Amino acid sequence: MPGVTPAEVLSNFGITLVEDPADNQPRLLVDLPAAELVEHAIRREEGRMASNGALVIETGERTGRSPNDRFIVDTPDVHDKIAWGAVNRPLSVESYEAIKAGIVDYLNERDVFVTRGMAGADRNHTRRLLVACERASQALFIKQMLARPLAREIARTGEPDFCVLAAPGYQCDPAIKGLNSSAAVVINFQERVILVAGTGYSGEIKKSIFSVMNYLLPVEDDVLPMHCSASMDPVTRETAVFFGLSGTGKTTLSANPTRLLIGDDEHGWSDMGIFNIEGGCYAKCEGLDAFHEPEIFNAVRFGAICENVVLDENRKPNYDDISITHNTRVAYPVEHIPNAWTKGMGTTPSVVLFLTCDAFGVLPPISRLTADAAMYHFVTGFTAKIPGTEVGVTEPTPTFSSLFGEPFMPLDPMVYAKMLGERIADGRTRVYLVNTGWIGGGYGVGHRIELAYTRSLVARALDGTIEDSEFVHDDIFNVDIPTTCHGVPDGILVPRQYWQSTARYDEAAHNLAVMFEENFEKKYSHLPESVKAAGPHAQVHADARHRGRGLLGLRH
């Protein structure tokens, strides 16, 4: 039985375009191949071709996400489920309708590029998507980012589970009640629609779809959605997941030539194992080079889309030039990584790694967590916002982001935390906290840990050999730290011993521990006492200083 056509779907919103209109009339261009989308983008002056074959575009004024312009429509079906607040801002149905009407009128006056894809490699938990874009370059972006359905799946597709209308050139009326600017990213769960207006940053489309899945998977499927990358051992088929906010190393650390890449950013964890929500990767590329990150460097070729990357006079990308933004990005299909596991599915994880970028430089490069400590760090999600990932962020800023992805989680954090706790409760999954940020001092004093060292630490955690090390217990942060690791200088593993001044380290560690405690008391005081007890303890610093002893105790 033939499926519903994109024109029929879009007509429900008032978009009257068709694929074969009369001469010189705007039209729908549906499911174009990547090469044709590149041609359209260049012809329409949306971007330029780089010497490596990638399409290079500029996103305009907004070079990162705009959290203050992200909204969820407050409808009866979600009113009592959404964790409303600064992250999930409510918008009235009336304001939503006004924005949608403007976008529909705007799109009816120009060609619209339609891409059909899927969110979720596991067909038991897939959501079908129809994305209508003003720009060919954004259609190419989402084509490469979504899980790609088979031709026969498209042929029999009925109504999509969600639609996206992306009109970066449309400026909303800031006078519409609830809006903060001329840009708006709006999710309507009742109508199953996402509106993206006034911003050319393609990550808004990607993260809006992720936010939708972060609601639908737990509520409808009992699946834990995760802001993480995932990889697989090619021999044992054991999997690992890497949690972390943008810029903490998820993409870089999961693109490992010795392992199979399942995905770099968004996954689900079901009773059967894990699966990639996407079909592509969206990597930061500031400072990208072939030596340190060859897999990502070589993935930037024809079919990839670079955002805000500067080209030299020979059209060669200059990844060190951040004159447009720190948040230079490249999107490419996962198949561009040679060792990609294109099935996008794997077994229950053997290892979970929480990646944090510590701007204070006091957390160890790697530490082992108990089950309760894993719950603690999952709900608190300490990291630093990296320059460029959000508008206005120009230097690392310490922050607590629940679940290492709070900006994309519509439900109460405890919904997700409880699901993770249930999945690691049997003890088969080892959990580590990995600091990819500063060591030897805070931002401006110390330096960011070398990628090669982090890779070695992660490799030893994945193969289990790090457990052969002697561990010391950090009394302030309440974690166990290995004292040796192959490929890593012993001196950097215990931060207090690496700082030039132990007194300054103690003070900085105490201050961060206080931040942990205050954040926990403010948001999570209702959690079990065992979880609270597994977190940092600022009082330990004062007690130790009073007794004149160190802050580390030996533990095997």
Language-model region placement:
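Charged, amphipathic alpha-helical linker segments immediately N-terminal to NTP-binding catalytic cores
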Residues: P160-F162, A166-P218
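Gly-rich Lys/Arg/Thr-decorated short loops/hinges at beta-loop-alpha junctions or inter-strand turns
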Residues: V78-W84, N188-V193, T397-L403
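N-terminal accessory targeting/assembly segments
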Residues: M1-R156, R547, L551-L552
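Conserved lysine of the Walker
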Residues: K250
